[in-house]
Amino acid sequence: MTNYAIILAAGKGTRMKSDLPKVLHQVAGLTMLEHVKRAVDTMNPAKTVTVVGHKAELVQKVLEDQSEFVLQSEQLGTGHAVMMAESSLAELEGQTLVIAGDTPLIRGESLKNLLHYHKSHKNVATILTAEADDPFGYGRIIRNQNAEVIKIVEQKDASDYEQQVKEINTGTYVFDNKRLFEALKEINTNNAQGEYYLTDVISIFKEADEKVGAYKLADFDESLGVNDRVALAKAEKVMRRRINHAHMVNGVTLTNPASTYIDSDVIIAPDVVIEANVTLKGQTKIETGAVLTNGTYIVDSVIGENTVITHSMIEASRIEKNVTVGPYAHLRPNSVLEEAVHVGNFVEVKASTLGKETKAGHLTYIGNAEVGHDVNFGAGTITVNYDGQNKYKTIIGNHVFVGSNSTIIAPLTIGDNALTAAGSTIHKDVPVDSIAIGRGRQVNKEGYAKKKPHHPNNK
């Protein structure tokens, strides 16, 4: 049977108190909508239709060519939202999943189980349900004495008895596609909210004596719909717990999982050690044997085998194997550290490549530079790469020794095996095998200090 999907993503999310559409708030590095779409993709739908409304262009940009889009210009309820997909789906044979775009914790495996249950029981509609300790605010699943689903009642429309029911509607369903759109023509706004409830189609099916079933989630957390920042924080916590657990099962050591923040798309090899208070974001990849110590922050970067990062920040950079970084180093975007490089405390590297076995031990800024292998930067070295309007490149060859407190004014080239004297300002090219000295000659004036107030003889 052919599968289709409708993702409901039109709402503003007033309780989020945000200019950003609700479904675009992030959980573990992805928007809620992206989490839902990935779960939906596990069922291999022939067509996915996303219903957009508030700031539709922003929502569409997230999925781009991954979905069809239909516009719900007025938000008149979930039933009305699904009606918007009629022109795309109504005439197709198959089964259609309807899911809200603000349910980021739903697992693809659960959706596949829901579809299998729906098909194997020959239902016209199947509701994804969950058991809630506190069901307040959720629609309730009402069953008869034979445990058959007879209707869904929204919180505001529920009787006192119905409000005691703990089985709740998660807002996710599978329908026979054609019957769904036929039933939608029969619903109305005769309810406390004055909206078209999608749940009313369940009553229509029951009145027609058609088979309606319910598949209950084993994990209530999957049912969480995010309507405010409190729920967003809860979703974040649950998702990060899942992510961390998966990495540990796969051979990664997390010394304190509760304080480790790893985004959804981060890839980590076995035998990586991650200490407390580490954050890994975006498209980061950590290779085997790496050690990330307390307080390290890495985004969109590759960290090579057996590299040690100590309390440092790495952004959009590539670090090869056997490198040491930190403490308190900062690699800004487009930096490359080749094998066995050492970047020490209070060193900043920006848009530069450092060749194999190069060392910048402390208090150094390297920007817009191409550095060869086995180069040593003395403390206090600065590449002066910006004149207020343009950035300029520094090229440093192999086996160069840069003396402490050197200021290198780009653009220039320092040749292989050259040296710069400590304290020099270098503003011209330095030839191969040369030493560059760019500082004033020292002059000692004997006895001069005796005239100054600090001298003991003058106190």
From Swiss-Prot:
List, from the UniProt record, the residues annotated as the active site of this protein. 362 (proton acceptor)
Query: Which reaction(s) are listed as its catalytic activity?
Result: alpha-D-glucosamine 1-phosphate + acetyl-CoA = N-acetyl-alpha-D-glucosamine 1-phosphate + CoA + H(+); N-acetyl-alpha-D-glucosamine 1-phosphate + UTP + H(+) = UDP-N-acetyl-alpha-D-glucosamine + diphosphate
Q: In which pathway does it act?
A: Nucleotide-sugar biosynthesis; UDP-N-acetyl-alpha-D-glucosamine biosynthesis; N-acetyl-alpha-D-glucosamine 1-phosphate from alpha-D-glucosamine 6-phosphate (route II): step 2/2; Nucleotide-sugar biosynthesis; UDP-N-acetyl-alpha-D-glucosamine biosynthesis; UDP-N-acetyl-alpha-D-glucosamine from N-acetyl-alpha-D-glucosamine 1-phosphate: step 1/1; Bacterial outer membrane biogenesis; LPS lipid A biosynthesis
What are the boundaries of the region Pyrophosphorylase? 1-229
Q: EC no.?
A: 2.7.7.23, 2.3.1.157
Q: Which residues bind acetyl-CoA?
A: 379, 385-386, 404, 422, 439
Linker: annotated span: 230-250
What's an example GO cellular component term for this entry?
cytoplasm
Q: Which cofactor does this sequence's record say it needs?
A: Mg(2+)
**Protein's recorded name:** Bifunctional protein GlmU
Where in the cell does this protein reside? Cytoplasm
Q: What does this protein do?
A: Catalyzes the last two sequential reactions in the de novo biosynthetic pathway for UDP-N-acetylglucosamine (UDP-GlcNAc). The C-terminal domain catalyzes the transfer of acetyl group from acetyl coenzyme A to glucosamine-1-phosphate (GlcN-1-P) to produce N-acetylglucosamine-1-phosphate (GlcNAc-1-P), which is converted into UDP-GlcNAc by the transfer of uridine 5-monophosphate (from uridine 5-triphosphate), a reaction catalyzed by the N-terminal domain.
* Family to which this protein belongs: In the N-terminal section; belongs to the N-acetylglucosamine-1-phosphate uridyltransferase family. In the C-terminal section; belongs to the transferase hexapeptide repeat family.
Q: How does it assemble?
A: Homotrimer.
Q: Where is UDP-N-acetyl-alpha-D-glucosamine annotated to bind?
A: 8-11, 22, 72, 77-78, 139, 154, 169, 227, 332, 350, 365, 376
Q: Which spans of this chain does the record mark as coiled coil?
A: none
What cystine linkages occur within this chain?
none
* Encoding gene (name): glmU
